[in-house]
Structures are given as C-alpha cells and as structure tokens.
Amino acid sequence: MWATHGLAVALALSVLPASRALRQGDCEVCISYLGRFYQDLKDRDVTFSPASIEKELIKFCREARGKENRLCYYIGATEDAATKIINEVSKPLSHHIPVEKICEKLKKKDSQICELKYDKQIDLSTVDLKKLRVKELKKILDDWGETCKGCAEKSDYIRKINELMPKYAPKAASSRTDL
C-alpha cells in the first residue's frame, strides 16, 4: 500500500517542473532588450515611476526591429498590439526588479515571449557569399534596411551586398580579399 502511494508521489513530482527559473538561453531577446532599456533609463536619469517607464518603453519600442519589435508587440508596447501587458514590465521595473525576474513573469503570462531568439549573425568578413542561399542574402540586405529592386539572380544580390558592405559593415568590407 505504501509503495503505491510512494510511487504516486514520485510520479507526481516528476511530472511537475522542479523549478520555474529560466534556463541558460531562455528569453534571450526579452532579457537583452529589457536590460538595454533599463540601462538607457538609468543613463538618462528618468524617473522610475510605472507611468514614466511605460511611456519610455513605448518610445523605445518605436525604434525596435525584428525580434525586438515582436517582443514589444507581445507586451503591448506597439500601436498594433492585441494585448496590453506592458504594466507587467513597467511596475516591476519601477521597483528595480532584475529583468530576468520580469521576463520569468512574462513567460508565465505569454510563453511566446521566451520563445523569441535572435537570428544567428553571418560573419561577412569570412563568409563566401556565393555559398549562401538567396533567402539569406535577402536577409542581409533587409537587416541593413535595404532592398534590391531588379535583382533576379543570386549574383545580383551578391553584387548589391558587396556594393553596400563598406557603408553597413566597414570592418568586414576592409577584411575581405575577394573584392
């Protein structure tokens, strides 16, 4: 009898998560972005009240691109956001709660927040552009805020990237030998 109760308890404990703490690599976009935001607030000596933090976060999110913009959307800091959980960021941040803890709470509200991961950056100084897919070449241009109108073939995208590289990635452009 005791063995079955012990087995049931062991089974129940194994099913429940041992800790709700974030693992390494979890919420990387959330932690990074909110960390930069918090540091920006401290550097500019902004008043740490929930209302002022909320206003500043909305302003900060206007400049966000890519995954960071998606995070802003999830917390309700963009104009087109469906839900508003921005107070789940502004209130704890006003009490100087670490961003890791804030992201942990946000994960409980919306698990998508912690599923965001930064895209791997391509090292333009060493990569052979000819071996990349057209999709990856388009992404490089998109990350720079550029488009390639009239590009039909891979070689057109490579030419455009090589043309713009000194402007957007000067270190990579100077270290490349195939130009």
Swiss-Prot record:
Residue list for modification Phosphotyrosine: 73
Keyword Transcription regulation: no
Cellular component GO terms held in the UniProt record: endoplasmic reticulum; extracellular space; sarcoplasmic reticulum lumen
InterPro entries: ARMET-like, ARMET_C, ARMET_N, SAP_dom_sf
Compartments reported by the entry: Secreted; Endoplasmic reticulum lumen; Sarcoplasmic reticulum lumen
Disulfide bond entries: 27-114, 30-103, 61-72, 148-151
Function: Selectively promotes the survival of dopaminergic neurons of the ventral mid-brain. Modulates GABAergic transmission to the dopaminergic neurons of the substantia nigra. Enhances spontaneous, as well as evoked, GABAergic inhibitory postsynaptic currents in dopaminergic neurons. Inhibits cell proliferation and endoplasmic reticulum (ER) stress-induced cell death. Retained in the ER/sarcoplasmic reticulum (SR) through association with the endoplasmic reticulum chaperone protein HSPA5 under normal conditions.
Family from the record: Belongs to the ARMET family.
Protein name: Mesencephalic astrocyte-derived neurotrophic factor
Annotated organism of origin: Bos taurus (Bovine)
Gene name linked to the record: MANF
